[in-house]
A protein has these predicted regions:
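A glycine/threonine-rich phosphate-anchoring loop and its flanking beta-alpha core
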Residues: 1-75
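Short glycine- and Lys/Arg-enriched binding-loop motifs that mark or flank ligand-binding interfaces
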Residues: 2-7, 16, 111, 115, ...
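A generic hydrophobic-helix recognition signal that picks specific residues
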Residues: 22, 29, 108-109, 205
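Short beta-strand segments
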Residues: 27, 34-35, 113, 208-210
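C-terminal charged capping/lid subdomain of soluble metabolic enzymes
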Residues: 53-55, 155-237
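Active-site segments that bind and position negatively charged phosphate/pyrophosphate groups
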Residues: 68, 72-188
Length: 237
């Protein structure tokens, strides 16, 4: 699911480095992408959920009606019913639309990184140990954190953050840092990892935040002190 709705669309080819995730790469568009939904019939349930985190992300970015549809139809998606086709097709169209207007991520394409500033930091600190935390789980926790951080900063209602968290939990995805197995890192360590994010510009943090579900935006120059305060609050929950 993850590859069908995310990495197969957009032409990014990247690898991790000791300094962070996806920091070395290029853009190379394929001639054709085929998504065989039949191959998902044998996908491990945990991996299916991980891919679903990216599906839900598209609704949170700029498509509240799709997010609402997922809230009502996620059981059919997980049962590999007709809803799965709709979910994957909608996700691909959503990403393709954003990529078409900003292929090399000079602007709006960064919206696709919703949840990833947090999520990549969690993955880096756990040394990309996928049995402990896979990418989709990191994105799920990161997306929930991004909505709570948006509410913390006064950009969106806490009800929106709670709604996203509730949906992630309803499909079995983690939504809190404490859900990561054997987590023993401090807020300061998380913040340090965030400064390795590819969206950092001139030493300043960039986050994808939201004014509501379906209303995400790029927030540049976010105060490290505000992030640290929020992370300490999160770790205390």
């Amino acid at each position: 699911v993850l590859s069908q709705v995310d990495s197969s669309v957009g032409g990014k080819t990247a690898i991790n480095s000791p300094h962070g995730k996806n920091l070395i790469g290029a853009f190379y568009q394929p001639s054709l992408v085929l998504a065989d939904l039949g191959s998902l019939a044998t996908l491990d349930p945990r991996e299916f959920r991980a891919g679903y985190a990216e599906v839900a992300k598209y609704g949170v970015i700029d498509d509240e009606p799709f997010f609402h549809w997922l809230e009502k139809n996620h059981a059919d998606v997980f049962a590999r019913g007709d809803g799965l086709t709709h979910a994957i097709a909608t996700s691909c169209r959503s990403k393709a639309s954003i990529v078409a207007r900003d292929e090399t991520e000079q602007g709006d394409r960064a919206l696709l990184n919703l949840g990833h500033t947090f999520g990549h930091a969690f993955e880096a600190l756990t040394h990309y140990d996928t049995p402990r935390l896979n990418h989709g789980e990191g994105v799920a926790i990161g997306m929930a954190c991004a909505l709570r951080f948006s509410a913390y900063l006064g950009y969106c209602a806490s009800d929106d953050a709670a709604r996203v968290e509730a949906h992630l939990k309803s499909v079995g995805l983690p939504s809190r840092i404490r859900n990561i197995s054997n987590w023993n890192f401090t807020a300061e360590q998380i913040l340090d990892a965030m400064y390795q994010d590819k969206k950092v510009e001139r030493g300043a943090l960039t986050f994808i935040l939201a004014r509501g579900i379906g209303q995400s935006f790029i927030a540049k120059g976010v105060s490290g002190e505000m992030v640290l305060s929020f992370l300490k609050d999160e770790l205390g929950r």
